[in-house]
Amino acid sequence: MEPAYFKWVLIPRARDHHHKRIREIQKRGYARVVFLVSSLPMWRFQHVYDRLAADSRFKLSVAIYPFPSFSLAEEEASMESLRSFFSEKAVPVLDLCGELQPGSVLRQLDPDILFYPQPYNHLYGNDLDSPHLADRLLCYIPYSIYMTNATWVYKSFFNNVAWRLYYGSQFSKAFASRVLFNKGRNIRVVGEPMADFFSEPSVHSIWKPQETVKKKVIWAPHFSIVDEGLHHRDSFTWLSETMWKMAVQYHDQIQFTFKPHPRLRSVLADLPGWGEEKTRKYYNQWERGDNTQLETGPYVDLFKESDAMIHDCGSFSVEYHFTGNPVMFTTHDMNKVVRDKNAVGKNGLLAHYVGRSEEDVRIFLDQVVLKGEDPMKQQREQFRKDYLIPPGGKTVAESIYMDIIQGLNF
């Protein structure tokens, strides 16, 4: 769409929708809020949900629907994990799976405020997409920390007509405001939502019990091992055997968690030299080992109780710094990894140890993890202070709640 069409048609129309919806809420005395969820690891709204639920002026609902990019197996696993998660929390769920017109079913809830999991125009490819629900107060909390200089995402319909975009830092707001057709007027800086999760104690230990005290190390490989583009990360191909050998070698000193990207399994199943059977056996050996385990769900408690991490994932290169623990990024070419990153992404990565070889990984385990020789500790702490501490001395959830209250004139 042309910038002029956004400026003179879509954005003014969105503001009219917002004003009308807010007047209806004020007249009614309460707001109906719906959280649309497609993946449990991307569910960053729990503290916001809990804070709104404590105020009787908000009537909350959760609706679940899979991303179209999921394979059938991924879809079934994702939806089942969401049903189980919300059932344990006694949160009623509107299950939109299998609906031919999920947007029409969602409209039966008549949401005033609608939180989306991603800000893309054609997220689902049906009437659940944001252009079909633009008469609502659309909100978005980024599911990951923006790390690149890419501008295309900000030019989407959603980002320009949404009522609120809740960003993590002034840096992110300033960058987006230069690109958005609405000049970022709908952006509010509240801090990274992960900060709320990391500030609370672990509910229960995720790590497998050991007979003796051991260091806890996470290995989190990305799935883009066959992508030859800018985001190609192939460290799994040269570390898969090495990491298992090290898990065996350090059996008495370290316990390892294999935390693969959710899509890695399906990629390996289709990869020559791997296939479904080899992939299944590989995952199973990590799950069943005495000092190893497989984790595919939420990772905050896993991070908080760990001592270090080895990975090549984008968002983890910032999020793991909430722990303050040493972390290694595995790549043969770190210059390529940081090339397209913004200040947040670049500085987060530069606060990592770099694993370019099996020997680098071994040195990291021996010197940093086991002996505690950690020369990058101060650099990590400075990064956390610069980018990860929420503003105003409030939790992220409280800042979002207060902004919604103010925006609705409650």
Placement of each model-derived feature along the sequence:
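A nucleotide-sugar donor-handling region in carbohydrate enzymes
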Residues: 2-20, 142, 157-234
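Active-site and donor-binding regions of nucleotide-sugar-utilizing enzymes
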Residues: 34-198
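Conserved catalytic-core segment of nucleotide-activated headgroup transferases in glycan assembly
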Residues: 44-54, 193-281, 355, 370, ...
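Short loop/turn segments at strand-loop or loop-helix junctions that form parts
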Residues: 63-67, 117-119, 142-144, 192, ...
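Short acidic-hydrophobic, aromatic-tinged amphipathic segments that line or gate anion-handling sites
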Residues: 92-99, 291-296, 349-364
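A donor-sugar binding/catalytic signature common to diverse glycosyltransferases
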Residues: 140, 295-339
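Nucleotide-sugar donor-binding patch of glycosyltransferase catalytic domains
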Residues: 277, 325-372
